[in-house]
Amino acid sequence: EDNTVLEAVLALPVKYRVPIHLYYYENYKTPEIAKILGKGESTVRSLLSRGREKLKVILKEEYDFE
């Protein structure tokens, strides 16, 4: 199951993949990710939110759950 989630993360477009990876796999907080990426905190929150939505779509296709 962990591999499936990782594969789904890797399938994301890079603009969503990087913040998702930093947040969930490297345990960075939103302000830290904003500094790393040179973006505003609100932008990072939006990227994380949109990335999560895209992950749901990918995983729903994989597992066919709602």
Name each model feature, range by range.
Residues 2, 16-17, 52:
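Short, leucine-enriched amphipathic alpha-helices that occur as contiguous helical runs
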Residues 4-13:
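Short amphipathic alpha-helical boundary/capping segments
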Residues 19-23:
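A short pre-motif secondary-structure segment
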Residues 31-32, 42:
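Residues within helix-turn-helix
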Residues 37-61:
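DNA-recognition helix of helix-turn-helix
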Residues 65-66:
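Intrinsically disordered, low-complexity basic tails/linkers immediately adjacent to helix-turn-helix/homeobox/MYB/SANT
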